Amino acid sequence: MSTPVKAAVFGTGSWGTAFGMVLADAGCDVTLWARRAELADAVNSTRTNPDYLPGVELPENLRATTDPAEAARAADFTVLAVPSQTLRGNLAEWVPLLAPDTVLVSLMKGVELGSAMRMSEVVEDVAKVGADRIAVVTGPNLAREIAARMPAAAVVACANEAVAQRLQAACHTPYFRPYTNTDVVGCELGGAVKNVIGLAVGIADGMGLGDNAKGSLITRGLAETTRLGLVMGADPLTFSGLAGLGDLVATCSSPLSRNHTFGTNLGRGMTLQETIAVTKQTAEGVKSCESVLDLARRHGVDMPITETVVGIVHEGKPPVVALKELMSRSAKPERR
């Protein structure tokens, strides 16, 4: 009998835990790293994550520890599932503990503030490993649905197709269907920008602007993503796939989406601080909208929806005023 694949998941939020379940259901031995002892104890003693996936029974071949060295030991895959703006600091602490040939897997959908780096670039910069040992899992993957073992598809992206195929095999279950892709740039941009567009659609929903507005924001948001991706060397087909349109539609349509919910609260008139106070988990788009806009400006790409979201979230611009400015921009051909 072959030895089971070993996976370490650093982060016990809803998505890290849900993906750990996927790996376990696919036959891997999974260890979750938890920052808090009480959460690790709950996972091990009750087979649940009461903080982030209450009521979901976790597989027997998934356990938790607060010791990062124990989690990382001999792991074939080291999955990173922490808030994107904390990745650099956390990973710097974990790098000395990592197994020599482990594949680093990013579940994060963001762009780092200041550097405007994608998450795989941060991993490469901090861990000093080549792109052939860094993979990304992305797509329309709402954690609560996956934890309920509802059908979902995803993209496993890596510059090395063989590594992508290894990870694909390690997380393929009857309910979770991963596809491989070597376009890491496009896959990561799709995930990062959709969080920003999810905020925009949520704001529109909170304002009661209707489905025409939602459809327009989704479509033009996809156009913004594609423009940025093309300038950065991404494959345009990526944006019509799971990492682009698929993820965007799920985020902009579901009440389970943290970014959509965050935007909805802003659109209903809550202040930024009030919205943060009622948001239990990280809505990545709140911080990443600034870094996505920074990235776009570095590449000379016009992203008006992203700019509008930054104005509302970080500059205190009233949504009604921001909407008026967005709608009164000069007319242009659609395919620009």
Curated annotation (Swiss-Prot):
The keyword Nucleotide-binding applies. NADPH binds at S14, W15, R35, R36, K109, A143, R258, E284. It is an enzyme of class 1 (oxidoreductase). It is found in: Cytoplasm. Its EC number is 1.1.1.94. GO terms for cellular component: cytosol. It comes from the Bacteria. Disulfide bonds: none annotated. InterPro entries: 6-PGluconate_DH-like_C_sf, 6PGD_dom2, G3P_DH_NAD-dep, G3P_DH_NAD-dep_C, G3P_DH_NAD-dep_N, NAD(P)-bd_dom_sf. Catalyzes the reduction of the glycolytic intermediate dihydroxyacetone phosphate (DHAP) to sn-glycerol 3-phosphate (G3P), the key precursor for phospholipid synthesis. This is Glycerol-3-phosphate dehydrogenase [NAD(P)+]. It comes from Streptomyces avermitilis (strain ATCC 31267 / DSM 46492 / JCM 5070 / NBRC 14893 / NCIMB 12804 / NRRL 8165 / MA-4680).
